[in-house]
Amino acid sequence: MSKYSGEEFSNNGDFYDDFAHTGDPALDMEYERNYYASRMPENVKYFLMNFCQAVKEGNLYDIQNMYENTFPQISDHHFDKSSWPEETEVGALVENDKVFMILYKELYYRHIHARIPGGPKLDQRINSFFNYCDFFNLIISAPNPVMLELPDIWLWELVDEFVYQFQNFAQYRARLTDKSQEEIQQLCVNHSNVWSILCILNVLHSLVDISNIKKQLEAISGGIDPNTVSGDFGKLSFYKMLGYFSLVDLLRVHSLLGDYYQAIKVLEPIEIHKKSAYSHIPACQISTSYYVGFAYMMMRRYADAIRTFSDILLYIQRTKQLYSTRSYQNDQINKQAEQMYHLLAICLVLHPQCIDESIQQVLREKNYHDAMFKMQCGDLEVFKSFFVFACPRFVSPCPPAADAPMEDYVKDPMEHQLQVFMDEVRQQKDLPTTRSYLKLYTTLPLAKLASFIDPNANDDDVSKLLIRLLCFKHKMRNLVWSKGPSGLEGTFKSGSELDFYIDDDMIHIADTKVSHRYGDFFVRKILKFNDLNRKLKNINI
């Protein structure tokens, strides 16, 4: 991985010239520590010192507790709409410990992105980028593995935040209407390499390579001990999990760029339709399914998209209590679940099929069926609104040209993907009507079907009907994954509830609909009733 240096950028922190410098480094450090400590609330000061000590000692239990519980609590209480203490203040408390300061700044800039009204300033975005570069250079460029222990949830959120800040910066960079000429010059010329797509891909691929995660996943699927191919770096959980999470975020990056084939391709070592030993972070598993399902939908593999969305939505229903204690994670997962219900509704309209009854029940309770009926009737505006709500926030890999007109280019990638999607929808918007007529008959003359669609039909309309029926056949025949580690593999299958062939001027129709299987539904209800009955019996009145 290429190294980057942030020396030319200042941190724009507060500087003070009233220190009583003695010339003795130890005394000066002690003075600065006491000076800055006096400016902080006591619980913040002790939290930072204990946090640093836990990182030094590699105490995973304490690190995870402070990261997941204490840090958010202090943020809510002291820094709800303001930033955490500056680097200089914290450095004086922890003796400028290099590793801890990089980790602290990662949390510091993440907090600014999430909490500060108006978002981060340009210099904060740049400084955050170079802090990530410092972290990745530290762990990737080292000749030997860095002995650093961090909980998996932090590693996932660190890598995912890295990609989020790239996405956020790309949108910020594309919005020229609220920037001065000097800011545009800095963004598009002076700092054109900051948060560049090449850097993001370089980092993620470097983490994948150094961890040998692909070889490890292939070994696991082949029943081989992954430690035989892991190498010195990959045998450590720290590097192994960073490599796995980088694969997932490569999926996200390629989806944001609209390269759906590559998005699925990069996950090939991961059997995405099977539960993995690495999928114990709910947010990671949900994010994976969201982007995989969306990529399948855009590739017109609706059956695979429906299966992906249905499986993960069932998982969310079962495991909601695992993340409900973390409000920010709960909000994020609920939003992504809502987006997936919208995408699932689109896929079911374009490719009707049976899904789990509990998912159907949610679609009914949240009134998705009304919108689905409108989409089936060809209402393109509903398709458009569902897509805009549920799709990722696409970005352009390149900044606007330095001499580009002063316009807002943020929506350009979104509008392009929307156009691609709507072109496909327009090709299919008449198919539900055709399907509804075919379902009523076992044999039907072409001329009669043409008259149903248009009472004033003539011979030309019958010829056009043949084109429509051919389109129906084509659109209902999808590539469907069946087995293997590659999500791109599959066999062509007809996903329609009916099939037909034409002999002379007669349509012969066969209903291939699979009847609902209610056994699983009743078993779940019985188990739920028994569980409720046990709880009632245990209540002491």
Swiss-Prot record:
Keywords from the named record: Cytoplasm, Initiation factor, Protein biosynthesis
GO molecular function: translation initiation factor activity
Entries under Pfam families matching the protein: Paf67 (PF10255)
Boundaries of every PCI domain copy: 308-516
Listed GO CC annotations: eukaryotic 43S preinitiation complex; eukaryotic 48S preinitiation complex; eukaryotic translation initiation factor 3 complex
UniProt cross-references to PROSITE patterns, sorted A to Z: PCI
Swiss-Prot/TrEMBL GO biological process terms: formation of cytoplasmic translation initiation complex
Compartments where located: Cytoplasm
Family designation: Belongs to the eIF-3 subunit L family.
Function description: Component of the eukaryotic translation initiation factor 3 (eIF-3) complex, which is involved in protein synthesis of a specialized repertoire of mRNAs and, together with other initiation factors, stimulates binding of mRNA and methionyl-tRNAi to the 40S ribosome. The eIF-3 complex specifically targets and initiates translation of a subset of mRNAs involved in cell proliferation.
Subunit composition and interactions: Component of the eukaryotic translation initiation factor 3 (eIF-3) complex. The eIF-3 complex interacts with pix.
Protein name: Eukaryotic translation initiation factor 3 subunit L
Native species: Drosophila persimilis (Fruit fly)
